[in-house]
Amino acid sequence: MGANGDVALSRIGATRPALSAWRFVTVFGVVGLLADVVYEGARSITGPLLASLGATGLVVGVVTGVGEAAALGLRLVSGPLADRSRRFWAWTIAGYTLTVVTVPLLGIAGALWVACALVIAERVGKAVRGPAKDTLLSHAASVTGRGRGFAVHEALDQVGAMIGPLTVAGMLAITGNAYAPALGVLTLPGGAALALLLWLQRRVPRPESYEDCPVVLGNPSAPRPWALPAQFWLYCGFTAITMLGFGTFGLLSFHMVSHGVLAAAMVPVVYAAAMAADALTALASGFSYDRYGAKTLAVLPILSILVVLFAFTDNVTMVVIGTLVWGAAVGIQESTLRGVVADLVASPRRASAYGVFAAGLGAATAGGGALIGWLYDISIGTLVVVVIALELMALVMMFAIRLPRVAPS
């Protein structure tokens, strides 16, 4: 019993998991790969699909914006609730199920309001599963290495992110732009993702057993989302400032086409190449973090500076290089940047931390997108100066962070 007599503690590691940590991470990564085929495939045609039902540009912008806000902002709710219930598998399965069900239905939605609701519901599914999923993964990553575990998961995710849009594009070409079969075929990878996830839950019902540290059991009272370590908040500040100076691919692609650097048909090809850079850099940064520690993250602000120096020129080679650098930065953001949270926050409050971190990351990304877009309209030279200033501030803040890193076994 705990000191107050109402919270039981147990030492994790008393029961050996049925799967090795690396196998758990790999299988979880395959689940993410299959799920990415589903929702990245759907997201690649969300705009045209809504337009086919009569949506205006404003409607598309509002619906997709609300969806992304829900995907990140609702984690402030789902994270603490997952910590309170300790039912991380249930939250993860529920979130994936919502995504797998809504995407095929989107293809047969006969009314605009139904399609809009399904687009938002799919993003809510990501909010439901996000903190719980990252918490489950963080336990196994304590053995593989935080950086390596999250990096392998992200690399597999990106394979799915490339396969999904290509699958949908192929189906549209075969069926003459029929959305129902193009999205209906995604039922197959979606069903496989859920089946594999349920199998993984049965094999490793308590992934926290990978960690050799005390953990709260039972049904503890809800952790206060704001009662998190000071170093965690400093890390959130570093992340926010970094993202304020990071442009979106939407703006990069706008520049490519509006300045006549690339034909519109070539933009998806460049994006696919950026996703390949994402996967490779995620692996490299993850392994580097486990070996060298926090200084690995110094690369992220530097990459953000290189993006604006290269991607907003009128030279096709420079723009392509800048886009590949953008993909590399995203790879670090989606892997190592998330993995560090687990080294800063103990298991009982980790889902809450992931919820807060994701919400802050989303707000900073949205703010950064608006800031970069506004500066782009004013002057590219001004944009470069402001981004350099922001990223230098982020570097200073990063070196003030003390990370109690857990070495891989």
Swiss-Prot record:
InterPro entries: MFS, MFS_trans_sf, Uncharacterized_MFS-type. Gene3D superfamilies: MFS general substrate transporter like domains. CDD domains: MFS_MJ1317_like. The keyword Nuclease does not apply. Keywords: Cell membrane, Membrane, Transmembrane, Transmembrane helix. Its main location: membrane. The chain crosses the membrane at residues 18-38, 47-67, 100-120, 159-179, 180-200, 232-252, 260-280, 302-322, 355-375, 380-400. Pfam families: MFS_1. It is found in: Cell membrane. It is a multi-pass membrane protein. This is Uncharacterized protein Mb2288. It comes from Mycobacterium bovis (strain ATCC BAA-935 / AF2122/97). The lineage of its organism: Bacteria, Bacillati, Actinomycetota, Actinomycetes, Mycobacteriales.
